Structure formats: C-alpha cells, structure tokens
Amino acid sequence: LTTKQDLRDNYPFGMFAVPRSEVSRVHASSGTTGKPTVVGYTKNDLDVWAKVMARSMRASGTKKGDLVHIAYGYGLFTGGLGAHYGAEELGCTVVPVSGGMTARQVTLIEDFKPSTIMVTPSYVLNILDEFRKRGLDPRECSLDVGIFGAEPWTNAMRREIEDAFDMHAVDI
C-alpha cells in the first residue's frame, strides 16, 4: 500500500513505477500540507484515465455530442485535464474554461449553452451567486448535469445545487 507519506519521502520522482523517460505527464498536489505529492502517468495510464472518465460521465447522463463546460483548474491539478480528455473520449465538445473568472463562467454558460458542467461543488456555488447577482434564474440555463469532485461536499450542498439549477448533480 503506497501512502501519501511514501510519495513525499520519495519526492519528486522516486515512486514512479516506470523510468521517467516513459512518463508522458506529471501531476502534483498543491503541497499545502507538506511537500507536493507527484504522480507520473504513462500514455497507457492517460488512455485508461480518459476511458474511465468517459464511462463516469456517461453514467451521469452526459452523452456524445453534448457541450461540456469544464471549470476545474488546468495544470498540475488533475481535475481539468482528466475531465477534458474524458469528455473528448466520450465524443463531447469541450469548453475548457478552467477555474476562476466567475463572471465569464456565467457569460459562457449563457452564450454557449452547455448541458454538463464539471467543477468543484464549492465553486459552482460561486457561479450560482453570480447568476443571482445578475438577476438570472439558474433553473432556466442549459445545465442538466453537474459532475462535481475534488473536494468533499454534503447532501445539503447537493440539494442546494440540484434545486437551484434544476440539474442532476453527481460526485466523481
């Protein structure tokens, strides 16, 4: 069993299961509680990850041809890229907005009309606040499915999100 401490003790690349030359991508935690934990992914790992994400998205109700708004951060954090490649694997059109720029998020949702959003549950509540600040009813927007993860959230948050957007909210 590999622990987070094992990854930190062997920072940055000491726990890779293959030579670094076979690693196609590196992701890492923010390191807020210590050294970042670094994980290397081979091409095969990335292909499997995309397929797993695509299956999870399909199970949520997202389907081929849907427009997917991705508001997870892109970069060392795994969220944005995992969601991105999973959506492409499923055959969706990706809007890779990344995190932040909440006003722009709402503008793009209103203009592009995505059916699925992928984001942290706490950040979608910020997006909800922006809808309300603009006097918009989020239930009237195009979002049918919310795929949320990367942090814990409560059943009360799920109900608030589902009720506010009239969407199906799932944890990934």
Predicted regions and their residues:
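Short glycine-enriched loops at secondary-structure junctions
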Residues: V23, L46, G73-G75, S122-Y123
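Short, conserved acidic/polar surface loops in the N-terminal third of protein domains
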Residues: V38-T42, K51, S60-T62, G79-G82, ...
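Conserved adenylate-forming
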Residues: L81-I172
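Residue-level marker of alpha-helix boundaries and capping positions
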Residues: F16-R20, N44, G73-Y74, P96, ...
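Residue-level signal for inorganic ion chemistry
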Residues: S29, V68, I117
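Nucleotide 5′-phosphate-binding alpha/beta core
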Residues: L1-A28, T33-K51, R55-A59
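Conserved AMP-binding loop of ANL adenylate-forming enzymes
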Residues: R58-V94
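Conserved ATP-dependent adenylate/AMP-binding module captured primarily in the ANL superfamily
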Residues: A50-L67, T102-P114
